[in-house]
């Protein structure tokens, strides 16, 4: 019991120390010296007592084990990093031979030391792993060489409906380019800015029956010739020759569907009043302009209400493609009278193949660019025209026929003059015009006004 007390007093010393490695051998040596001195001093007096109660053989292996532990601990002290086996042996020896207070203090110090070592090892491992992961990221998730406009166009063109919402564009980019999935800062704002600023992208409002949020984004039809450059990754337009080929293909496509450039151009290339329609249900002809074949519809002439007649009907009304009739013109339902031709325009346009079919409608094939030169005039029904008299239909048709050879004497066919002699005019118009058209078609090649 005294032996345990002595050891307890000796083991209280390591509380003020900083390192357990330097104190463990000293503690073991002090234990050995105290054990030897205590045994030598008490053995002569209590030899039999120790012999019966504390036999020497159990103490000798204990001292031998302590010496072995001391040797094992001295060897690791020569190496810079402490071995884990030495720490565990020291911990076991301290717990076995020390008192509760000393053992608790030593155990706390060992735990702190082990925690620091584990933390350092963990940090070193993390640094190594993060370095490897960084290399993998740099090798695998490089920034794609495409501009934001190219990414947007790529996403919209590859969508099934050729339209996407803003979130749909984000999802496409993150799905196909892991770099943007890992780095989400900044590029989404850039996508929004490019959508708003680039004219290639058009915002389409969502239909009220379509569930969801956000508008759709589509590509402008004019961006068909825009492609993504292979080296730069930016949007580029095709060359002039490629555009010409693409325009030719578009023209053929539009001709097959009936959509033409002149349909959209409207009255910009045709001098008509805005309330008259440019579309004709029988538009099937083409115009060769400057040697280039371009689709061109057969436009109804607004003066057709005066020049054409429904030969099958007896109501003396002039059926036209745009729904105008002489009855409406005479009664003053339309504020503006229709266009009328001067002599030069009449001579230039009428022999171009005006046909009066049995149905009463007509199909006019414009063949001269002079028709686009604005050789028509406007007049109001209330303006008197003293040059015209309501004599008879034969005189009017004769005057129209004579005007084809004398462009300097223009004659007009005003709507106001048709009011008194409408029945006689409509009765004799078909016969006079048919003779006139036949004569003009035969001599159209010698007419100097046709170009």
Curated annotation (Swiss-Prot):
Q: Which residues bind DNA?
A: 142-233
Stretches for region Disordered: 29-80, 101-143, 389-417
- Which Pfam families does UniProt cross-reference here? Forkhead
Q: Where is the composition biased (Basic and acidic residues)?
A: 108-143
Q: What is this protein's tissue specificity according to the annotation?
A: Retina and brain.
Role according to the record: May determine the nasotemporal axis of the retina, and consequently specify the topographical projection of the retinal ganglion-cell axons to the tectum by controlling expression of their target genes.
Going by the entry's taxonomy, the superkingdom of the source organism is recorded as Eukaryota
Protein's recorded name: Forkhead box protein G1
| PROSITE patterns registered for this protein in UniProt | FORK_HEAD_1 (PS00657), FORK_HEAD_2 (PS00658), FORK_HEAD_3 (PS50039)
Keywords from the named record? Developmental protein, DNA-binding, Nucleus, Proto-oncogene, Transcription, Transcription regulation
Please provide, alphabetically and separated by semicolons, the GO molecular function terms listed in this UniProt record. Answer: DNA-binding transcription factor activity; sequence-specific double-stranded DNA binding
Q: Name one GO cellular component term.
A: nucleus
Q: Major place of localization?
A: nucleus
Some GO term, biological process aspect, for this entry: which one?
negative regulation of neuron differentiation
Q: Where is the composition biased (Basic residues)?
A: 35-55
Organism the protein comes from: Gallus gallus (Chicken)
Record localization? Nucleus
Q: Does the keyword Membrane apply?
A: no
Q: Where is the composition biased (Low complexity)?
A: 389-412
Presence of the UniProt keyword Translocase in the record: no
